[in-house]
Amino acid sequence: MSTYTQPVMLLLSGLLLLTLAIAVLNTLVPLWLAQEHMSTWQVGVVSSSYFTGNLVGTLLTGYVIKRIGFNRSYYLASFIFAAGCAGLGLMIGFWSWLAWRFVAGVGCAMIWVVVESALMCSGTSRNRGRLLAAYMMVYYVGTFLGQLLVSKVSTELMSVLPWVTGLTLAGILPLLFTRVLNQQAENHDSTSITSMLKLRQARLGVNGCIISGIVLGSLYGLMPLYLNHKGVSNASIGFWMAVLVSAGILGQWPIGRLADKFGRLLVLRVQVFVVILGSIAMLSQAAMAPALFILGAAGFTLYPVAMAWACEKVEHHQLVAMNQALLLSYTVGSLLGPSFTAMLMQNFSDNLLFIMIASVSFIYLLMLLRNAGHTPKPVAHV
């Protein structure tokens, strides 16, 4: 059976268009708020509203998928995000945008949960790593192209909203030509997210998603600040961030394939060790290009491998709930990690960015090394 079936390819095609729209809005909304002379705290609160929507969307989507299936859940999520886009143009103001960014956050999280769950349910224990690697590649390529679009087109609010909303709705079109089957058995009771978070045999995967959120959130949010404080120009900062993200894109497929072939525990151990090495290299002022490349290649691929690990440990009908738990764990890590690291950097040294990344990675490595490798055989394999 082919890994990249027609439903999978069409799903990823639609996701690419949605990711473009999401990346453009996430970049421009803070700038539009600043142009409206809103204070820094107001910009921060609007951003928090979006992430709060992410959390709510993550919690709701499992129920929606069980009720109406993957296809219609995907359509609904896309329409919710499109409404969040278009709503920004109806009334410009703090409270209005607070509400619309919350709506967009709900839609965005629903899209991620639907797509990730559909891919995991479509795959097996032998190819799930490659499926999630393809998903992450589409995500990062879409984010990169979205940033490129921002630099090439008009960034005026009323110029951007029509085509961004159009992109979101166009993301629905590929799935009109296929049906992604929801293979959760109807006679199974709903699985709670809490039970997935407490599942002992999947704990390494859950912890891996939290660590991944801390690492990626810190790199995305604080790496530009670190480089700026080192005297790097804005143009060069863009170049070094491109190196970091490009490494993440290039690492997805080979690492996903290695995880499928040699086992996810071994690959996770190597990945985390490489993240620690990359962090030490940055602290030692070694050649920045190779240091950032190995940091990006290993750090940006932690999430899909940890997710695939956790999904091996549950029954097939529990995959959607497990995906919700993993996305929730990642979101919590990406929210708390940068906040704590930023406080350390402000009060002590910018080098705390890489000390923090190396420290949490080392803790996770100890967890991985404690696992003797005689875990139960994967059960979510059909």
Swiss-Prot record:
Cytoplasmic topological domain residue ranges: 1-13, 66-78, 123-130, 178-203, 256-269, 312-324, 369-382
InterPro entries the record matches: MFS, MFS_dom, MFS_trans_sf, MFS_YcaD, MFS_YcaD-like
Ranges facing Periplasmic side: 35-44, 100-101, 152-156, 225-234, 346-347
Compartment(s): Cell inner membrane
PROSITE patterns given in the database record: MFS
Predominant location: membrane
Molecular function (Gene Ontology), one example: transmembrane transporter activity
Keywords of this entry: Cell inner membrane, Cell membrane, Membrane, Transmembrane, Transmembrane helix, Transport
Highest taxon of source: Bacteria
Membrane spanning stretches: 14-34, 45-65, 79-99, 102-122, 131-151, 157-177, 204-224, 235-255, 270-290, 291-311, 325-345, 348-368
Endpoints of the signal sequence: none
GO terms under cellular component: plasma membrane
Membrane topology summary: Multi-pass membrane protein
Family, per entry: Belongs to the major facilitator superfamily. YcaD (TC 2.A.1.26) family.
Family matches, as NCBIfam families: PRK03633.1 (NF002962)
PANTHER family: TRANSPORTER MFS SUPERFAMILY
Protein name: Uncharacterized MFS-type transporter YcaD
Organism this protein belongs to: Escherichia coli (strain K12)
The organism's taxonomic lineage, starting at the top: Bacteria, Pseudomonadati, Pseudomonadota, Gammaproteobacteria, Enterobacterales
Gene from which the chain derives: ycaD
